Swiss-Prot record:
Compositionally biased tracts (Basic and acidic residues): 7-17, 62-97, 314-333, 542-574, 760-770
Residue numbers spanned by region Disordered: 1-46, 59-97, 201-229, 314-337, 383-406, 448-482, 494-520, 542-693, 705-786
Biased composition (Polar residues): 201-217, 645-656, 682-693, 712-729
Protein name per its UniProtKB record: Protein SIP5
Lineage of producing organism: Eukaryota, Fungi, Dikarya, Ascomycota, Pezizomycotina
UniProt GO cellular component terms: cytoplasm
UniProt gene name: SIP5
Entry keyword set: Cytoplasm
Recorded superkingdom: Eukaryota
CDD domains linked to this entry: SIP5-like (cd24139)
Assigned protein family: Belongs to the SIP5 family.
Principal place of residence: cytoplasm
InterPro entries: Sip5/DA2
Function: May negatively regulate the SNF1 kinase.
Length: 786
């Protein structure tokens, strides 16, 4: 891979050297350096170059473009920037902690929070040097009131805590005597307790320098007269005033000075003096010196590192804005803009969070020359300064303040003070939102208001919008979508603007003024949301109504189905209860008719054969009359059955039997009956003629002739005595009275049953007819129908 890259680089260099005009010697030397000296390699390289030129003529040997470096993304750029800031912060922290401090505290953070430090470091530094904000104390993870001085020193310096009776060599200290302090040269006091020479004014420098300067022998003694020096000093002062007025305000900031380095306070090391009464920060839970910031509202302690992390929320729409808070409400601001409420207290949630700081009763480290009492506190001893400031300073063990201090107080430092760019960020966010709103307004105008409302394109566009809305919305025509709502609002807005504007302005001003556009957009948005809510409510109500109607129809269908099923079952049960009674009554009538006819024929045959020429026809009517008057009804023949009673009986039985299916048992019975009675019963000959009745009578006579000869008396007794055998029990349903299940519209059957013989004239033929009576009637009905 490396060789290929080298060849490409060489070929590119050779190509550039070959085609360049007036090339420098450096390029020629480079070309000679890369040219091979060997003949074989030279020939091969020439052949290769020739081949490459040939490829170039064909367009195949074009040189590759140099690979472009991948552009750095925004995330990578921000990550690299954060890494650089962290490295610079660590370096500055090490330098500041080594060289600078304020009353034993530091001017840089101690790494409790690892996030970005977006507060103004210059302002925080100035407030700490002015002793209006607590310095960044070093926090202790653990603290015990029984610790000794060297243990407190080790904890404050970040060293491992030694044993109480063990003093490490690096923690040994020796209190300096006053004589050594008095022997310090005045130049050191001048440099440490006063403003440095470079930072003094020009008049002050000139005056002091003229005093220390030796008198030149060329000058006359009169040059140093008081009058001349006064005039010259006055001129210098006026010049300094005029020049200082032209300097920028940043150069007028107070100058820092280094107070004398005294590591002891009241005979104790400064670390032991600070941390002997350590207090815990309720937010980061680290132990600090008792000289912490106190909240202005609830007088709660808070360290500076936690305080600088509290800030205003990012700019956001006013939905979450508290309308009850009158302090943050500005009537001059237009509605609908982004807002950013002041930070609230983390303890009592009171807005305009601010802190107050009471410094310790000594001064060490950096200070400003313009601050009052700096020199007095620096020159005085620790004991005298402590005794003089006990009355004026706040003791950490005093009673907590119960009155809230106003956020406008000079001693209160708010979160907006350490982040003065919050207004700039809010303005930038509002400007960005305004640009977005303007872009949205332009799109809105281009989409809905650029066309002439009265032109031919307006109805088409409106119809297209409505058609699109009908396709998108599930409700179709009944449920308008947000597109219809927007079109309606735009149309109404155009009509309103056209009515309010003059005829001349209506053609030029397509959009409302910028001042009122935001308000109108908010109104339109609210109306659009209201219309959408109404649409959703109507759609929900329509869906609920459709669902309810569907449930109602389903319930009605179910009830109808159940009613049909109940009616069908009731009809089936009614038919089952009616058919056996009708069939039994009809079959009993037929049996009685057939038995009566058979009995009459047998009596005729017996009377003709048994007698010896004696004509017994005369007394027969009398005997039959007696029997009919006593126990029997009148005799009925087949011809008599051809009347209305028999026809109605057959029609009723056929009508009832047509509703039932023929079972296998009934088919077997019908076959048995047909074999017993012959072809005359199941034949297809019509029953309404005399031949059919004669054939039936002939069949019954042949059956009677087959009976063995018996005495006339026995036969008469057997024919005339009441039946008390099993046939009587089996024929009991045939002689029953008409039941309640029998149809009331069949009076013939009732008459026939009432006129049938009751348990009289039973015979074997009658038994067979009774057994097969269930199939005799359908055959007769079919024969009648045919």
């Amino acid at each position: 891979m490396g060789n290929a890259a080298t060849k490409e680089s060489r070929s590119s260099q050779e190509h550039s050297a070959r085609h360049s005009r007036g090339g420098s010697t450096a390029s020629t030397a480079a070309y000679d350096h890369y040219r091979p000296s060997d003949g074989i390699h030279a020939s091969s390289s020439r052949a290769l170059r020739g081949g490459r030129s040939d490829f170039a003529l064909l367009g195949l040997g074009a040189e590759r473009e140099p690979v472009e470096h991948r552009r750095e993304t925004r995330q990578e750029r921000e990550a690299r920037k954060r890494e650089k800031e962290n490295a610079a912060r660590i370096k500055e922290r090490q330098r500041s902690m080594k060289e600078e401090h304020v009353d034993g505290g530091y001017l840089v953070t101690q790494g409790v929070y690892v996030g970005t430090e977006d507060f103004n470091k210059a302002i925080v530094r100035q407030l700490m040097i002015e002793r209006r904000l607590a310095p960044f104390w070093r926090g202790l993870n653990d603290f015990s009131e029984s610790w000794t001085e060297h243990q407190l020193m080790a904890a404050a310096r970040g060293m491992p805590i030694p044993a109480p009776d063990e003093v490490p060599p690096e923690l040994e200290y020796k209190i300096p005597s006053k004589s050594s302090a008095e022997k310090q040269p005045p130049e050191r006091n001048l440099n440490t307790l006063m403003v440095p020479i470079t930072s003094r004014s020009q008049s002050y420098n000139s005056d002091t320098s003229s005093i220390n300067r030796t008198i030149s022998p060329a000058r006359s003694p009169g040059a140093l007269s008081p009058t001349n020096s006064f005039l010259r000093g006055r001129a210098k002062t006026l010049a300094s005033l005029t020049t200082s007025s032209k300097t920028p305000a940043s150069d007028m900031a107070p100058r820092e000075l280094q107070l004398p380095k005294d590591p002891f306070v009241n005979g104790q090391p400064i670390e032991a003096y600070l941390y002997k009464d350590a207090s815990e920060c309720p937010i980061c839970f680290l132990y600090y010196p008792p000289y912490l910031n106190k909240t202005r509202c609830c007088d709660q302690p808070i360290c500076s590192e936690c305080f600088v992390q509290i800030k205003r929320p990012d700019p956001h729409p006013p939905e979450h804005h508290d309308p009850n808070n009158s302090e943050t409400t500005h009537p001059d601001e237009p509605e609908g803009q982004l807002v950013s409420e002041p930070a609230a207290c983390p303890f009592c949630v009171q807005p305009e969070f601010g802190v107050m700081y009471t410094p310790p009763p000594f001064r060490r480290g950096l200070a400003y020359a313009a601050s009052p009492g700096v020199h007095a506190l620096a020159n005085s001893s620790a004991a005298s300064s402590a005794s003089s400031l006990v009355s004026g300073g706040a003791n950490p063990g005093t009673r907590r303040r119960a009155v809230s201090i106003s956020a406008d107080s000079p001693s209160v430092i708010t979160t907006d003070r350490v982040r003065p760019d919050w207004a700039t960020k809010l303005a930038a966010a509002r400007a960005q939102a305004a640009r977005r709103s303007a872009a949205a307004t332009a799109l809105h105008t281009a989409a809905y208001m650029m066309n002439n409302p009265g032109g031919p394109g307006e109805p088409r566009r409106r119809g297209m919008l409505r058609r699109t809305a009908g396709q998108d919305s599930p409700g179709g025509r009944t449920a308008p979508s947000h597109v219809n709502a927007m079109a309606y609002l735009a149309e109404r807005r155009v009509v309103t603007d056209r009515d309010n504007a003059s005829p001349v302005d209506s053609t030029t001003n397509l959009a409302p003024p910028r001042a009122s556009s935001r308000r109108s957009r908010i109104d339109e948005l609210e109306e659009m949301m209201m219309m959408e809510a109404i649409r959703l409510s109507l759609a929900a109500e329509e869906e609920r109504r459709k669902k309810e109607e569907k449930e109602t129809r389903k319930e009605a269908k179910r009830r109808e189905k159940e009613a049909k099923k109940a009616e069908k079952s009731a009809k089936k049960a009614g038919l089952d209860s009616q058919n056996p009674s009708n069939l039994t009554s009809s079959t009993s009538s037929a049996n009685s008719a057939v038995q009566t006819a058979g009995g009459a024929n047998s009596e005729l045959d017996m009377s003709a054969n048994k007698g010896k020429g004696v004509d017994r026809s005369e007394p027969r009517p009398g005997v039959s009359t007696e029997a009919g008057s006593s126990t029997e009804p009148p005799k009925i023949t087949i011809k008599d059955l051809k009347g209305e009673q028999f026809s109605s009986m057959l029609e009723g039985s056929s009508k009832n039997m047509h509703l039932r299916h023929v079972s296998s048992a009934s088919s077997s019975n019908s076959s048995l009956v047909e074999s017993a009675f012959g072809e005359s019963i199941g034949s297809g000959t019509p029953h309404n003629g005399s031949s059919s009745s004669l054939a039936a009578i002939h069949g019954f006579r042949s059956l009677a002739a087959m009976i063995d000869d018996t005495p006339s008396g026995d036969s008469g007794e057997s024919m005339n005595r009441p039946g008390s055998t099993n046939e009587q029990v089996q024929g009991a349903p045939a002689v029953k009275e008409p039941s309640e299940n029998s149809a009331p519209n069949e009076p013939d059957q009732v008459t026939l049953l009432s006129s049938s013989p009751s348990l009289e004239q039973k015979d074997t033929l009658g038994k067979e007819v009774h057994m097969s009576s269930a199939e005799v009637l359908p055959q007769s009905s079919l024969g009648t129908a045919s």
